[in-house]
């Protein structure tokens, strides 16, 4: 159950997080514990997003130099199933890599990623990085665009920090070898996208994320103090309690290649694991985006915020409208970047009637939430499956130069974008909510920092402005460095810590036939969950549909859980497919609970029962962990917490 509360809890939420003293947990590491925890939902009663102390740019500079440490004493004490590092980074997108490259100057670093290192949301980002780099532009203008797009729910201090520090972070990327497009005058070519009042998007054709990922991975590869662990699935954070505070000391993981459980003990953990796109059937996110970081953090007693604000990108490629259909169903939808509309692309229905001018004065350059709802309305009214995005009126050379990846993908399926409109449809794209973070990426769990899509910093408010995601990741990855170093210096991690948490049990002990049945059942449950989310928790919502989704998700999860038990699944077992399913259930429930708590329509959350924006409700949604309640195992820890010794 979730209760709607009044009042505000600080970032530390000492009075709101209830943990049984005298215990330590691998926070929810395995599934079916006798202990249940649930979320308490409240709409924060003060407009400022984070109850954390502001830190100026000058304060952010290194207050003391620890010195270059090739490997700490603890990091040398490795064995086959336990590894010790000063810093553990979960995720290999722009946020995780950029952070790792900074903290590696002060200690040993492990980067854990669940697939190949390049397989992140960053790698699929087409548009670019927004930054004020033109004399005619200003930080104030970028701030205003961000706040308007965010439906005035953005935290103004966070917005100012990001818009002010962004240009320097972009320059650092260039210095590290990232190559961006330049104009004929030799200066950076700055594109314009929906919601922006100026040209301020730094880009590398329509493959910006890929170029940034390439440059950062190359730098990581050249850094001897960073160890990268691919195909390591993060299971749960290792946490304990001391003096009313919760501390994080690393993470348990599953090496998918060796099928061994690997424990990473660390002084500092940065969570940069990306979003939750795969709670929906169609998403631009890669298959790794299953909400692992948010779900782990929720089980670890971290505060979660603004989960109702799921951004649907207005223009994903519609395979239904292609002349040559793909041979197999895509794992993730192919994104048609915002920059196509920014470059003059026009949206039509299938009767070639331009429709955006009927919905918003900004037409195709309106923010994403407006465009996605407009397309959704057209599709429902006309009974069609896609609309058309036309850029063919622009010079062929310009189109091919700016959008080579899109042009090539469409041509593979028989469509020439220089002559024909592109069939597009909205798809789940970005989670504006996540783990609640302060101005330095800090969470209410000591030693746990967050950056990138997994975090909710207050920048995006109720809707993210185009190309602000990579920007936010860069800024907060850098801002988390100094407090991480300070915590690392002060932290006392005894090697014996590794023995304090129970180890997960691998599912390989089950017979192959049983495992096959479980994996097949899990695939079915995943598809059913995605269908429920799209039908009842999509672009347009209602209270009845949200409540319907709530009980359908609960029933589906219980049915799946019971099937696993009948087939011999044990309470402490882990497997990649089942852990992902667990996290998907958890995140889906958080989205629904948050959506039910917001009794207005704002930004990405539009509900027919409360169709108007209300000033009195201009507050973030905050989910606090609270007393034991009756929930399924998505929120259950394996064991009670131990007192930190």
Swiss-Prot record:
Requisite cofactors: FAD
Amino-acid positions noted as binding FAD in the UniProt annotation, renumbered to this chain: 92-95, 114, 121-128, 292, 453, 469-470
Active-site residues from the entry: 368 (proton donor/acceptor)
Pathway it works in: Cofactor biosynthesis; NAD(+) biosynthesis; iminoaspartate from L-aspartate (oxidase route): step 1/1
UniProt KW keywords: Chloroplast, FAD, Flavoprotein, Nucleotide-binding, Oxidoreductase, Plastid, Pyridine nucleotide biosynthesis, Transit peptide
Transit peptide start and end: 1-70
GO MF assignments: L-aspartate oxidase activity; nucleotide binding
Gene Ontology terms: cellular component: chloroplast
Main location: plastid
Top EC category: oxidoreductase
One annotated GO biological process: NAD biosynthetic process
Alphabetical list of Pfam families matching this protein: FAD_binding_2 (PF00890), Succ_DH_flav_C (PF02910)
Location(s) in or outside the cell: Plastid, Chloroplast
Cofactor info, note text: Binds 1 FAD per subunit.
Catalytic activities: L-aspartate + O2 = iminosuccinate + H2O2
EC nos: 1.4.3.16
Residues annotated as site: Important in orienting the L-aspartate substrate: 193
Listed Gene3D superfamilies: FAD/NAD(P)-binding domain (3.50.50.60), Fumarate reductase/succinate dehydrogenase flavoprotein-like, C-terminal domain (1.20.58.100), Succinate dehydrogenase/fumarate reductase flavoprotein, catalytic domain (3.90.700.10)
Function: Catalyzes the oxidation of L-aspartate to iminoaspartate.
PANTHER family: L-ASPARTATE OXIDASE (PTHR42716), L-ASPARTATE OXIDASE, CHLOROPLASTIC (PTHR42716:SF2)
Family: Belongs to the FAD-dependent oxidoreductase 2 family. NadB subfamily.
Protein name: L-aspartate oxidase, chloroplastic
Protein species of origin: Oryza sativa subsp. japonica
């Amino acid at each position: 159950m979730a209760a709607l509360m009044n009042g505000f809890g600080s970032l530390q939420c000492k009075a709101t997080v209830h943990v049984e003293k005298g215990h330590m947990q691998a926070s929810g590491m395995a599934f079916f514990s006798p202990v249940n925890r649930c979320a308490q939902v409240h709409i924060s009663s003060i407009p400022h997003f984070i109850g954390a102390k502001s830190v100026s740019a000058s304060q952010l500079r290194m207050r003391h130099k620890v010195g270059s440490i090739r490997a700490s004493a603890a990091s040398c004490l490795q064995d086959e199933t336990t590894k010790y590092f000063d810093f553990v980074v979960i995720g290999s997108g722009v946020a995780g890599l950029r952070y790792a490259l900074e903290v590696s100057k002060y200690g040993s670093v492990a980067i854990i990623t669940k697939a190949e290192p390049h397989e992140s949301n960053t790698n699929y980002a087409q548009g670019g990085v927004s930054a004020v780099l033109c004399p005619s532009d200003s930080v104030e203008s970028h701030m205003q665009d961000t706040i308007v797009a965010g439906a005035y729910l953005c935290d103004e201090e966070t917005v100012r920090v990001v818009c002010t520090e962004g240009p320097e972070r972009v320059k650092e990327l260039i210095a590290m070898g990232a190559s961006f497009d330049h104009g004929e005058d030799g200066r950076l070519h700055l594109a314009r996208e929906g919601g922006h009042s100026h040209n301020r998007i730094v880009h590398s054709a329509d493959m910006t994320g890929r170029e940034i990922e390439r440059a950062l991975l190359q730098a990581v590869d050249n850094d001897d103090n960073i160890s990268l662990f691919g195909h390591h699935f993060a299971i749960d954070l290792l946490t304990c309690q001391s003096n009313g505070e919760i501390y994080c000391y690393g993470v348990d993981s599953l090496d998918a290649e060796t099928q061994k459980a690997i424990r990473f003990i660390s002084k500092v953990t940065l969570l940069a694991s990306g979003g939750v796109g795969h709670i929906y059937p169609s998403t631009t996110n890669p298959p790794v985006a299953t909400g692992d970081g948010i779900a782990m953090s929720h089980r670890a007693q971290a505060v979660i915020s603004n989960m109702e604000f799921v951004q649907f990108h207005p223009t994903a490629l519609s395979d239904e409208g292609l002349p040559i259909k793909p041979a197999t169903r895509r794992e993730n939808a192919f994104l048609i970047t915002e920059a196509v509309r920014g470059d003059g692309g026009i949206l039509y229905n299938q009767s070639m009637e331009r429709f955006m001018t009927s919905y918003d004065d900004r037409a195709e350059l309106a923010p994403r939430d407006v465009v996605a709802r407009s397309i959704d309305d057209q599709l429902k009214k006309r009974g069609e499956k896609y609309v058309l995005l036309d850029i063919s009126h622009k010079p062929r050379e310009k189109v091919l130069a700016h959008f080579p990846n899109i042009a090539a993908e469409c041509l593979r399926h028989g469509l020439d974008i220089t002559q024909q409109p592109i069939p597009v449809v909205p798809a789940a794209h970005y989670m504006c909510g996540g783990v609640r973070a302060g101005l330095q990426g800090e969470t209410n769990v000591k030693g746990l920092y967050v950056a990138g899509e997994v975090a909710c910093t207050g920048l995006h408010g109720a809707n993210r402005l185009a190309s602000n995601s990579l920007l936010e990741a860069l800024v907060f990855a850098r801002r988390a460095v100094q407090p991480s170093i300070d915590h690392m210096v002060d932290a006392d991690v005894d090697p014996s810590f590794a023995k304090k948490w129970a180890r997960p049990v691998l599912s390989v002990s089950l017979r192959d036939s049983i495992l096959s049945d479980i994996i097949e059942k899990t695939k079915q449950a995943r598809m059913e969950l995605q269908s429920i989310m799209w039908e009842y928790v999509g672009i347009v919502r209602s209270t009845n549909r949200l409540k319907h989704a709530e009980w359908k998700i609960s029933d589906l999860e219980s049915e799946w859980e019971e099937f696993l038990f009948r087939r011999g699944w044990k309470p402490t077992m882990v497997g990649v497919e089942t852990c992902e399913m667990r996290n998907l259930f958890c995140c889906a429930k958080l989205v629904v609970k948050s959506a039910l708590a917001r009794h207005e329509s704002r930004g990405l959350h539009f509900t027919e029962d409360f169709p108007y924006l209300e000033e009195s409700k201009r507050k973030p949604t905050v989910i606090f962990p609270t007393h034991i309640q009756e929930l399924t195992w998505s929120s259950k820890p394996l064991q009670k917490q131990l007192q930190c010794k």
